[in-house]
Swiss-Prot record:
<keyword id="KW-0822">Tryptophan biosynthesis</keyword>
<comment type="function">
    <text>The alpha subunit is responsible for the aldol cleavage of indoleglycerol phosphate to indole and glyceraldehyde 3-phosphate.</text>
</comment>
<comment type="subunit">
    <text>Tetramer of two alpha and two beta chains.</text>
</comment>
<feature type="active site" description="Proton acceptor">
    <location>
        <position position="49"/>
    </location>
</feature>
<dbReference type="InterPro" id="IPR011060">
    <property type="entry name" value="RibuloseP-bd_barrel"/>
</dbReference>
<comment type="pathway">
    <text>Amino-acid biosynthesis; L-tryptophan biosynthesis; L-tryptophan from chorismate: step 5/5.</text>
</comment>
<keyword id="KW-0456">Lyase</keyword>
<protein>
    <recommendedName>
        <fullName>Tryptophan synthase alpha chain</fullName>
        <ecNumber>4.2.1.20</ecNumber>
    </recommendedName>
</protein>
<feature type="active site" description="Proton acceptor">
    <location>
        <position position="60"/>
    </location>
</feature>
<comment type="similarity">
    <text>Belongs to the TrpA family.</text>
</comment>
<dbReference type="GO" id="GO:0005829">
    <property type="term" value="C:cytosol"/>
</dbReference>
<keyword id="KW-0057">Aromatic amino acid biosynthesis</keyword>
<keyword id="KW-0028">Amino-acid biosynthesis</keyword>
<dbReference type="InterPro" id="IPR018204">
    <property type="entry name" value="Trp_synthase_alpha_AS"/>
</dbReference>
<dbReference type="InterPro" id="IPR002028">
    <property type="entry name" value="Trp_synthase_suA"/>
</dbReference>
<dbReference type="InterPro" id="IPR013785">
    <property type="entry name" value="Aldolase_TIM"/>
</dbReference>
<dbReference type="GO" id="GO:0004834">
    <property type="term" value="F:tryptophan synthase activity"/>
</dbReference>
Length: 269
């Protein structure tokens, strides 16, 4: 079993839900990411999603787009993100780390370092899962096999518009968990309709046997608690970025820890 599967199995045995915070690697300061990841774990995070900065992030709203632009301006690319994971792993060998991003940085990395280099280097760095927003499941079987060979799960997005056929395609290649995008649109947009999420999850589970995490639109502990009643995991990204984007270096980790502790407490209530 993968580190992600182990984590979900342990949580399930205790009747708990996974808290999955997201942050853009290298934001808001290029050197802060490993410390921020450790703070997230201290606050109760079960899995960490680390965004790989990209210049054209079509699924991201303005908050995460701006974070990615800042990280890119600071020189953060895929190689630097892998180094951040390596540094995190010096002190933490148990918390799963998922890279979330787009195909272009992965393809450029492989052009530079050779075919299969991304899966190899990500595995060596200590990455547990990869979510590539613009890789369709029907074209991912070889990529999924490459990742599996290095102990890495391939995670996919599902949306309110996903058909049963798309869910079946995802189910064939997905492992770890799937990420249900609870709103139409981009990250950080709109108000979350928890009843609509609750209605959709049984349809997803007819086809998908891995845990289902829900994200997009979760901004506070109360919403996280409501989603946690029906989903296996709660993913929070844009709200964290907003909380830390204008903060001085010395306050970033503490603000994140305080926010996530409140969410963790609500999830466990």
């Amino acid at each position: 079993m993968s580190r992600i599967a182990d984590t979900f199995a342990e949580l399930q045995s205790k009747g708990r839900k996974a808290l999955i915070p997201y942050v853009t690697a290298g934001f808001p300061f290029v050197d802060i990411t490993p410390a921020l990841m450790h703070g997230m774990v201290e606050a109760g995070a079960d899995v960490i999603e680390l965004g790989v900065p990209f210049s054209d992030p079509m699924a991201d709203g303005p908050v995460i787009q701006k974070a990615g632009e800042k990280a890119l301006a600071l020189g953060v690319g895929l190689a630097q993100v892998l180094e951040m994971v390596r540094r995190f792993r010096l002190r933490n060998s148990t918390t799963p780390v998922v890279l979330m991003g787009y195909a272009n940085p992965v393809e450029r990395y492989e052009q530079r370092h050779g075919k299969g280099a991304f899966a190899r280097d990500a595995g060596e760095a200590g990455v547990d899962g990869v979510l590539i927003v613009d890789y369709p499941p029907e074209e991912c079987e070889q990529f999924a096999a490459d990742l599996r060979g290095h102990g890495i799960d391939l995670i996919f997005l599902l949306a309110p518009t996903s058909t049963p056929e798309r869910m079946q395609q995802v189910a064939r290649v997905a492992s770890g968990y799937v990420y249900y995008v609870s709103l139409k649109g981009v990250t950080g947009s709109g108000a979350l309709d928890t009843a609509a999420v609750e209605a959709m999850l049984p349809r997803i589970r007819e086809h998908v046997k891995v845990p289902v995490g829900v994200g997009f639109g979760i901004r506070d502990a109360a919403t996280a608690q409501a989603i946690g009643r029906v989903a296996d995991a709660v993913v929070i990204g844009s709200r964290i970025i907003q909380l830390i984007e204008d903060q001085p270096h010395e306050k970033v980790v503490g603000i994140t820890v305080d926010f996530l502790r409140g969410v963790r407490k609500a999830l466990d209530a």
